Regions:
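Extracellular/periplasmic, surface-exposed regions of secreted and cell-surface proteins
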Residues: 1-269, 273
Length: 276
């Protein structure tokens, strides 16, 4: 990907925003070239026994340009199980009007690298401002891009889901329920610490933070036919809560500061106030 940007200011004629009408001493031009690359391999295996017992295995093997060789690739497997209880002989005798009752569960590991800046495993330089160097006039300057972190890698989400779906009398009443839990670890954060001002660098991103997201969803539906008229309606309700498992932060200065401002082990979006 290549980009080129130019601009100026102090236009002599404000209604004509062309470069030629701007102050020549304020004209600037810049550009950059960027290469990105992603690769992946996806696989899935299904097994169905008599339309009653269902198993699925899947995996992703993903690679990204953002991390160094050795941390570049991640393997993320998953498995899901299903049991169609309504296909069992004993259940058909017990509840013959129940069209479908399926119990399901799944577990998967998912990787993500979207929140990370690229090439943090490399030391390097970037253009930064202009400087007057002796009698040579204005010269473009450069600065370091920051401390390198060669250990940076994917952050992972471990996702578990348990639920069921049921349908009675050809969908006259249907219910779906799912409970889920997602544990994320290795989220990007900058370590809190003080460095000497003469060091001239900032701390890099690391795989530090983690959180836990739990919740459930329920969907209730109804469909029917009256003469030549078919209709269906449904309603759903869901709730979720996110808890900060670990958040990188400065050490508390006292017990009150720790109680008031330490979010570790607490739910997100807590509101503080006086009870009335």
């Amino acid at each position: 990907k290549r980009s080129w940007v130019t601009g100026t200011r102090d236009f002599a004629i404000g209604l004509i925003p062309d470069l030629d009408y701007g102050d020549k001493t304020n004209q600037e031009a810049s550009g950059k070239t960027q290469e990105t690359a992603h690769a992946g391999l996806v696989g899935r295996l299904n097994y169905d026994f008599s339309n009653r017992y269902l198993v699925e295995f899947n995996f992703r093997y993903d690679g990204t340009y953002k991390f160094r060789e050795g941390n570049r690739w991640g393997f993320f497997p998953g498995v899901s199980l299903g049991w169609r209880v309504s296909e069992e002989a004993f259940f058909k005798k017990l509840l013959p009007d129940m069209d479908n009752l399926k119990i399901r569960a799944s577990y998967a590991k998912v990787g993500d690298e979207g929140d990370f800046d690229a090439f943090q495993y490399l030391d390097g330089y970037t253009s930064h401002g202009s400087y007057i160097m002796g009698s040579n006039g204005v010269t473009s300057g450069m600065t370091t891009v920051g401390m390198a972190n060669p250990w940076l890698t994917w952050y992972e989400s471990k996702i578990m889901n348990i639920g069921f779906e049921a349908s009675y009398h050809r969908g006259l009443i249907s219910v779906e329920f799912d409970w889920f839990r997602r544990n994320r670890s290795g989220l990007p954060a900058t370590r809190v610490g003080s460095l000497p001002t003469i060091f001239g660098e900032s701390m890099p991103q690391e795989n530090l933070n983690s959180d836990i997201n739990t919740g459930f969803e329920i969907v209730v539906g109804h469909k029917n036919r009256i003469g030549n008229f078919n209709y269906n309606v449904s309603a759903n309700f869901s709730t979720t809560r996110i808890k900060y498992d670990y958040v990188e932060r400065a050490a508390s200065t006292n017990m009150y500061d720790d109680w008031r401002n330490n979010t570790n082990g607490r739910y997100k979006d807590i509101r503080w106030g006086k009870k009335v």
